[in-house]
Amino acid sequence: MSWLRNSSHRESAPVSVRLSIIPLLFLLASMASIGCGGNSGGFSEPTFDERTEMPKAADDSNALRFGAASMENPIELSESYYPLLKELSEKLGRPVRFVPLKNNDELMQAIVRGQVDLARLGPLVYLNLRDRTDLEVLVRPVKKDGTGSYAVIAVRNDTPMKTLQQLRGKSIALGDPKSTYSNIMPRKMLRDAGVSMGDLSSVGMLGSMDNCAQNVLNGAYVAGAMSDSIYEKFRTRAIGLRILARSEDLPGEPIVARSALGAATIDQVRRALLSVRDPEVLNAISPGQEAYVPAAPGDYDRFRAFE
C-alpha cells in the first residue's frame, strides 16, 4: 500500500487494484463515521476526484441513507451497492449513505425508526412495512424480456433428481424467514408439490441466499432456495447449479422511500433511479437486470396470499 502513502512515487498501482480498493474505502469511511458519532450502521458515500478515483470527505448533513438487508460479508455487500449509490449521489447532487443491516427484521426497525430513508425490500417485507409506516414505492427491477424475479429451488448439476417430490427424505437450505424468494415462496412451491417440511430430512435456516447457494455447491444440503438472480450468480461456480423448480414470474424487489422525505425529494430519487441504464451498475445488485421501471403499491398485493 506504499503507493497510497507516498504521493511522490510515480509508479501507479495496477488498475484492478486501484478499482477494487474503492469499495473497501467506502466501507472504512462508514466505520470512521460511526466512530465519530455518525448515524450507526452506514457506509458513507464519498464524492470523487475524477483524476484519482479516490474518495474525498463528504458532508453528511444532507445525506440520504439507503438500507438493504443481507448476511453477506460487508465488503462484498458494499461492492454490490457501491456503483448504484455513486451514480445516485452524482444525479441527486447529495451524498447517499449505505446502511447495511444483518436481516429483514433489523431493516424494518431502521425504517420505522427513521434511521433509513431509502431501501431495497423483499415484496412481503414491503407489505409488512406498508401496514406499519408511511412508505412510497418508487421502482422495481425488470429483465430485458420485461419479467421481474423468480423464486428458485436449485440443486447441484450432479444431482439426479428431476422433481420436487424427489426431495422427500433430502435436505434443503432456506434463507431469512421473511424472505419472499428464499423462504416463503419456496415453502409454497413445496406445499403445492405435496411436500411438507416434515417430509424433508433437514431444513437449514441459513439467513442469506448466498449461503443457501454456497451450501448446495459444497454438498451440505441437497437443495437450496434463492432468487433467480442469486442462482445466476452461482450457477457456473464449482460443479454448478441447476434449477429443480421455479415460481411464477413475480415483481422484483422494490426500492422504497419514507414518505417523510417529501414529494419533491421522492420524485427526484424516482427519476434518478429510472434513468440508470449502465448494465454494470444494474447487474452489480441483481444479475440479469435491464432497468428500473415505475412501481405501484398494487404490484405487490398478490403477495398477501403467500403470507
Question: For each predicted feature, which ranges?
Answer:
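N-terminal hydrophobic or amphipathic helices and topogenic motifs
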Residues: 2-5, 9-17, 26-106, 112, ...
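Beta->alpha turn/N-cap motifs
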Residues: 65-70, 81, 100-104, 114-132, ...
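Stable alpha-helical elements in mature extracytoplasmic
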Residues: 80-84, 103, 107, 122-125, ...
